[in-house]
From Swiss-Prot:
Keywords from the named record: Chaperone, Cytoplasm, Stress response
Any one GO BP annotation for this protein: protein folding
One Gene Ontology MF term: adenyl-nucleotide exchange factor activity
Protein known as: Protein GrpE
Encoding gene, per UniProt annotation: grpE
Length: 219
């Protein structure tokens, strides 16, 4: 029996599909061609070696977490615990800062009031002299009266008020008695030698007085 000659010079058997030759050709490709193509793709994408290494590490981490779900759950629990601790620390610091602000504001106000009281205390002798001049009729008119009125207006605007008038009930905390002419338990101010002053609720100076009996008792 005669055989059919292969006029194309290849080794295909009759009826064998042509794509078998393509597979054989792939087997004979140079192994260095594939990496060269990959390198060309990397260069065209603008990636360097460090970026590729970071991407590989990221993919490795994803693969590891996928392979071990328990590790991911543990890490999440740890992060939640750390977040709770940091939240508590932040709340504590916030409360401490609020207390610090309140304390410093309070101390600042006390310092301001003390400074005002010191300055006003030095003005009180001037007010005493002006009041004495007014009793003698020297402030009925003229520039001295205008000065007195302006000074009184300023100190009153700062919350300063005078106290101590004849007939007021004696108060040992606010009145300094230089003489006691009373005969009973009820004591009032008989003579006011020097009025006292206070700034709001702060005592600037006590009033200097002579104690006497109430008017009805004296009769």
């Amino acid at each position: 029996m005669s055989t059919t000659d292969n006029t194309n010079g290849d080794d295909r058997r009759p009826g064998q599909p042509e794509w078998d030759d393509e597979e054989n050709n792939f087997e004979h490709l140079d192994a260095t061609e594939v990496p060269a193509e990959e390198e060309a793709l990397v260069e065209s994408a603008g990636l360097d070696a460090d970026t590729l290494a970071d991407l590989e590490d990221a993919f490795d981490g994803v693969d590891a977490s996928t392979e071990d779900p328990g590790a991911t759950v543990g890490e999440t629990s740890t992060l939640e615990s750390e977040l709770a601790e940091r939240t508590e620390d932040l709340q504590r610091l916030s409360a401490e800062y609020a207390n610090y602000r309140r304390r410093t504001d309070r101390e600042r106000k006390v310092g301001v009031e003390a400074a005002k009281a010191k300055v006003l205390g030095e003005l009180l002798p001037i007010l005493d002299d002006l009041e004495l001049a007014q009793k003698h009729g020297d402030l009925d008119e003229g520039p001295l009266k205008a000065f007195r009125d302006k000074l009184v207006s300023v100190v009153e605007g700062l919350g300063v008020s005078a106290f101590g008038a004849e007939g007021d009930v004696f108060d040992a905390e606010r009145h300094e008695a230089v003489q006691d002419l009373s005969s009973g338990d009820d004591k009032v101010l008989g003579t006011v030698l020097r009025r006292g002053y206070q700034m709001n609720d702060r005592l600037l100076r006590t009033a200097m007085v002579i104690i006497a009996d109430p008017a009805e008792d004296a009769q």
